Structure formats: C-alpha cells, structure tokens
Amino acid sequence: QPNPAKRVYIPKKNGKMRPLGIPAFADKLVQEVVRQILEAIYEPIFSDNSHGFRPNRSCHTALYQIKSTCRGTNWVIEGDITGCFDHIDHEILLKILSKKIDDGRFLELIRKFLKAGYLEFNQKYNSLSGTPQGGIISPILANIYLHEFDKFMEGISAEYTKGKQRRPYREYQILQYKRNRAKKKGNQEQADEYLRQMQNIPALDPMDKNYQRVKYVRYADDFVVCIIGSKATANEIKERIAGFMQKELHLELSREKTKITNLSDKRVRFLGYEITKSQENTKQVVDSIGRKKRSVNGTIQLVVPGDVIREKLKPFIKKGKPYQVGARVNLPVIEIISQYNAEIRGLYNYYCLATDVSTKKSTFQYYHYFSMIKTIARKEKSSVKKVIQKYGIDVPRKNGTGTMRIVGIRYNTKEGPKTMTYFNDSLKKVSRPAGEISDQFGQVLKGGQLMKRLNSDVCELCGAEHCALEIHHVRKLKDIVKKYRKRGTPMPNWVWPVSYTHLTLP
C-alpha cells in the first residue's frame, strides 16, 4: 500500500501557490517502474500534437510546430483547462488504461497510487480526484488522460479541413491583367506601377470560405488551436471543445481564460513566448526554380515578451541603472561570474527560437553584465574601472575583426590553466529546436569551492583531519584586521586563501 504523499507548496508566476505531492522514497522507485511500463505502451501511440513530458519533445518542439504549420492563421483559440491535474477523474482514467492494459493487478497498483492521499500539517487527506503534481507517474497519466482529447482534436481538424488552396484574389488578378497588357504595349513604367500595387495586396483571397484549416498543439494542459477560417468557425470549435471536456473527461474549460484571438490584431501568449503573424507584403525571395514569391506574409513569428525582460532585470537594476546583487558579494569571483553566466545562458537557451532574441537579449546583457562588474567591485571595495582593468581579458570578436575586453578570471585545473569570462556566445535566433540534451548530471552535481573544501576533510584553522566540519562565514575582512592589530599578533594563514568569505571549521 503506497504511503500518502507529502504536500508542499511552491510559488506560481501569478503570485498564487501550486500544491505538489512528494511521494515517499520507496514509492518513487515503484512509480518509476510503472512510468517506464506506461511509456513503453503509450509513447508509440501518443499524438504528434502532444509535446509535454515526452522523450525528445519540449516547449521548443511545440512552438516550432506552431511556427512551421500554422502559416496564414486568422484565429487562435487559447485553451485553458481549469485545474486539470487536480480534477482528473480516477474512474475515467482507469477505464482509459484498461483499453490497452489487460492486467488487473497493474491497474489496481495505479488505483492505489491515485487513492493514496496526502499529508498536510501531519493530517491525512484522501484523494478523490486528480493526479498529484510532483509524483513521478503524474505527467504520463495526465498525457494518457488527455490523449482522448488529442484524438478528438485530430477528428476536428480533419472534419473542418476544406479546399486544396485559396482561390485567387480578384483585385490581384485585375492588376495582373493590366500589368501584362502594359508590358505588351511596351509601357514598362506603367507595368512597374501595377507591380507595386500588386505587392501591397494578397495574391490569394484570405477570406475564401471554401478554404479552411484547423491546427492543434498541446503542451501538458496548455493548448492552442490555430484556425484558417471565420470567427464563427472558431466559436463553433470552442463550444465543441468545452462540450467534449465536460462530457467525456469531466474537465472544465475556463470560459474567462479561454479566448478567441484575431492574430492580425493581437499577439497570443503561449509557453512564455508571444505568437504573432507577419503582415509584410513587399519582401520577396527567389525559389529553387527562379520564381519570385513573398517571403514573410502570413508567417508565424515567435517573439520575446517585453515584460519578461523587464521582470528578469529587476534584481539587477536600480533607478534605471545597473546595480550590484548584495547576496552574491560574499561569493568567490569565479562563482559570481558563473552565476551570472548561468542566468543569461538559461534565458537565451529558452528564447533562442524568437525572431527578436538578439535585440531583446542585447538589452538584457548590457544591464546584467555591468551588474556583475558592480557586484565584484563591491566585493573588493573597488570601482568598475579598476575591476575591468584587473579582470579584463581580451577575446576575439565573433566577426573576426580584432579583439574585445570582457571581464573574466583565469584559474588552474588538473587539465591545466583555464579561463572563464562573462557569457560571450552568439545571441542569434535558432531556426529549429536542438536535439535531446545529453546527460549533464556530472556538471550539475560537481559542486563549487565550498564542497571541495568540505570534502577535503581538513580543518583550515588547526589542520585537524577526519572530523565533522561546517562552514563559518567571514563577513568583513576589515573587522578581522582590526582584531589582530589590537592584539599585536600576525593574522593567520587561513585569512587570505578563503577570499574573505568562508572558513571550514569543526
């Protein structure tokens, strides 16, 4: 019998708290085995439109699918399922599982995990519905549950697909006819004028009622439906989705948060990106057989929301200027640089698909970089200029035109001397998502300077070995200096190597 999960709360972006259920260690082991079995059964049949909690899929693959398949979209349904994970019906889920799994004991084990309940403030509560977020099997159970919705949407997409291509736009055809006549008469100037007018209107009728497409992408409980068609069609599909959710899955589609948006007028927020549609008619490219065609009209663009950059910059700005982070002053310089690098690298790695990633990240990078320099300057009671002079390292420019000076640090390792500078990689847009990330646990868990000194098992004050150690923080070097000056005794050797911040003692 599984133990009740421990309930903890983590903050959400909107200020509310998200409940998580942390299973006991023994239950985690069993859940992992169950997860692997379920993945082997269901992964081959899951929809290509589902991207959440699946191998080799991510937010990037979901966004790339929207960008590559939804060109010309008029309307977007932004789907929001009210408390999806908390309202999954156990009986419906087990019924869905029984369609593919003919093993009563295995299904009973899953039922026990679902009914195990949770502990909060040492009091047990029963689980009447939902899969607790935080459990190892919860994501795949949610995907299995919502796979029924994926199949429903694939049916909707096939049902509403009409026509092979849009009909020609009448005004465009008239101008094309006039241009051809002008060229035959030798009036090239008039023909060029007609061409300019043609470039400002669509070649195909964007409101063709006989051409319709419906595309659907889901990541966990967030989904979007991209529609080439009328608003009436979008409203009809929205009502059918709400009806299916309520009748078949006992889930509720939020009437307030589920919106229908005209992509020509307003951007859609999905997975942290903003989705918009390009309206440029004049840019042209030449295809593989030499024909000119419009390059961007109607294409889907992914952009970085402006409020994301402003929110990320809050810890590093004060009164509109770069500002130091006081909580990092006590860290060694190499760890300060490492933390700043991790922040900007993480931000870029997530938004690398955005069209404007270079512009937005350059703005972030300026304030972030000088915040790092000011943090080091405060640590060493110095100035920005002196920090750049002391830690500046000349590195080659990306375009090959000379060098540039970036703050960094040189350090020694077993493999030899190495250099760490502030993040200087290219901030260009990435056209396609990267493949599966390789196992990085070794790098994540290797620890910093403090872990190495603790693991050395030696007291830095008296040299005692093989004893329990803890880290003592030395806040201000000047206080130590005053103390030993008053005593008239020399300062011990441990003061200088520890960068004035930490000391390992029994």
Identify the meaning behind each predicted range.
Residues T501-P506:
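Conserved small/polar residues in nucleotide/adenosyl-binding loops
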Residues F25-R35, E43, K67:
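Duplex nucleic acid-engaging cores and interfaces of nucleic-acid transaction enzymes
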Residues C459-C462:
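Short cysteine-rich clusters marking metal-coordination/redox-active sites
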Residues P2-V8, D48-N49, R54-R57, T61-L253, ...:
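Conserved polymerase palm-domain catalytic core
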Residues E39-N49:
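Charged boundary/loop elements
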Residues I228-E236, Q246-E248, R269-D457:
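Active-site and adjacent loop segments of nucleotide-processing enzymes
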Residues I201-Q212, A327-L331, Q443-K446, T489-P490:
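Active-site-adjacent structural elements in folded domains
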Residues E465-Y500:
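Histidine-centered nuclease catalytic patch
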